[in-house]
């Protein structure tokens, strides 16, 4: 989405980012989310404001000057779905040791989807639905 509206997205140098990562909103609020990707926003579009970042991803969440936002994590992944992805990708994307370590992280971390659902609700309630271009 960032690329579509004039930003820049590039493939990361190195391995994919897979696991549970901590993000920090511009107001200081922190949250954990599931990540599984190689690509990253390296320059946000002029029509977007950065609203969250992480130690590995400077532009983790963008809010646009129209009713939309984009994220560099997977708010749609449930814990069970993410575990299935990890197991299916064991030895392909991560070594067995990395997969087991990531599964252990998932057991310890609380990943809430509430903040994302709240943002979607705000976008749909504050703006007419036909003005919402996309929520990714």
Task: State the predicted function of each range.
Residues 10, 24-136:
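Amide-donor transfer/coupling interface in amidating biosynthetic enzymes
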Residues 1-25, 32:
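Cysteine-nucleophile active-site neighborhood
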């Amino acid at each position: 989405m960032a690329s579509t509206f004039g930003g820049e997205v590039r493939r990361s140098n190195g391995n994919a980012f897979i696991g549970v990562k901590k993000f920090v909103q511009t107001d200081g609020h922190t949250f954990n989310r599931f990540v599984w990707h190689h690509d990253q926003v390296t320059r946000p579009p002029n029509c977007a404001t950065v609203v969250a970042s992480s130690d590995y991803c400077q532009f983790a969440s963008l809010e646009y000057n129209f009713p939309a936002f984009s994220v560099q994590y997977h708010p749609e992944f449930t814990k069970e779905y993410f575990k299935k992805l990890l197991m299916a990708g064991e030895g392909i994307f991560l070594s067995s040791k990395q997969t087991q370590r990531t599964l252990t992280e998932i057991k310890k971390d609380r990943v809430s989807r509430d903040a994302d659902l709240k943002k979607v609700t705000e976008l749909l309630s504050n703006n007419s639905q036909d003005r919402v271009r996309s929520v990714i």
